[in-house]
From Swiss-Prot:
Residues 2-228 form the Glutamine amidotransferase type-1 domain. It is found in: Cytoplasm. Part of the phosphoribosylformylglycinamidine synthase complex involved in the purines biosynthetic pathway. Catalyzes the ATP-dependent conversion of formylglycinamide ribonucleotide (FGAR) and glutamine to yield formylglycinamidine ribonucleotide (FGAM) and glutamate. The FGAM synthase complex is composed of three subunits. PurQ produces an ammonia molecule by converting glutamine to glutamate. PurL transfers the ammonia molecule to FGAR to form FGAM in an ATP-dependent manner. Pathway: Purine metabolism; IMP biosynthesis via de novo pathway; 5-amino-1-(5-phospho-D-ribosyl)imidazole from N(2)-formyl-N(1)-(5-phospho-D-ribosyl)glycinamide: step 1/2. This is Phosphoribosylformylglycinamidine synthase subunit PurQ. It comes from Haloquadratum walsbyi (strain DSM 16790 / HBSQ001).
């Protein structure tokens, strides 16, 4: 059993994801998107769509990668209950391919944001958040230019009513404020689940908050443990 990290042209966080998973004792391997998943779905513990700049972010971030044939395999795997996580550019691919609602667009500050942010856990009942308690504040790095989550008012209300919001940007005390929102995301949303709670997308990078030598936080381990 293993976790597949999908490598698109322009991905640059696939090795990071593999290393982070291996660090917490989870077998992981990279798969080139043109090769597909083939028959390996039967032996999968999960799939990660990693960060980067797939296809140079032409058209829209994640838009071209969302049309890769492997996405059909990923959607089929999601329907079978296999965990799928989209991180940063992978989150954009997830939204563009319909794995989750909404879209990620240009930051309201119109610049690339690279910093460590605070996130408040909104729903601790999913595989991605069961390592935490609701209301817990964690620290995870971000690095994106198109991370502003947008969604229609009706869909946003559905996300809230269906408890699909995993994380919101907050301050160190857990307060949801405009100042704590690094990109202008609606409702300070940083991560959500899709039609299945085994499918999630988030802009922050949990793989960059897993190895202690990489920074001050290892809070990302709790998210990646969903694959264990």
């Amino acid at each position: 059993m293993t976790v597949v990290v999908v490598q698109f042209g322009g991905s640059n966080c696939d090795r990071d994801a593999v290393r982070a998973l291996q660090h917490i004792g989870i077998d992981a391997t990279r798969v080139w998107h043109e090769d597909g998943l083939n028959d390996s779905v039967e032996n999968l513990d999960g799939i990660i769509l990693p960060g980067g700049f797939s296809y140079g972010d032409y058209l829209r971030a994640g838009a071209m990668a969302a049309h890769s044939p492997i996405v059909n395999d990923i959607q089929a795997a999601a329907e079978r209950g296999i965990p799928v996580l989209g991180v940063c550019n992978g989150a954009q691919v997830g939204c563009e391919s319909g794995l989750t609602p909404g879209a990620f667009t240009t930051n309201d500050r119109a610049r690339f944001q690279c910093e460590t942010v605070h996130l408040r856990v909104e729903n601790a009942t999913t595989p991605w958040t069961e390592a935490y308690e609701a209301g817990t504040v964690i620290e995870i790095p971000i690095a994106h230019g198109e991370g502003r989550f947008e969604i229609t008012e009706n869909e946003y209300e559905m996300l809230k009513n269906d408890n699909q919001i995993l994380f919101r940007y907050c301050d160190a005390s857990g307060n949801i404020t405009d100042d704590a929102n690094p990109n202008g995301s609606r409702g300070n949303v940083a991560g959500i689940t899709g039609n299945y709670d085994t499918v999630a997308v988030l802009m922050p990078h949990p793989e960059r908050a897993t190895l202690p030598e990489l920074g001050r936080s290892t809070d990302g381990k709790g998210i990646l443990q969903a694959f264990g």
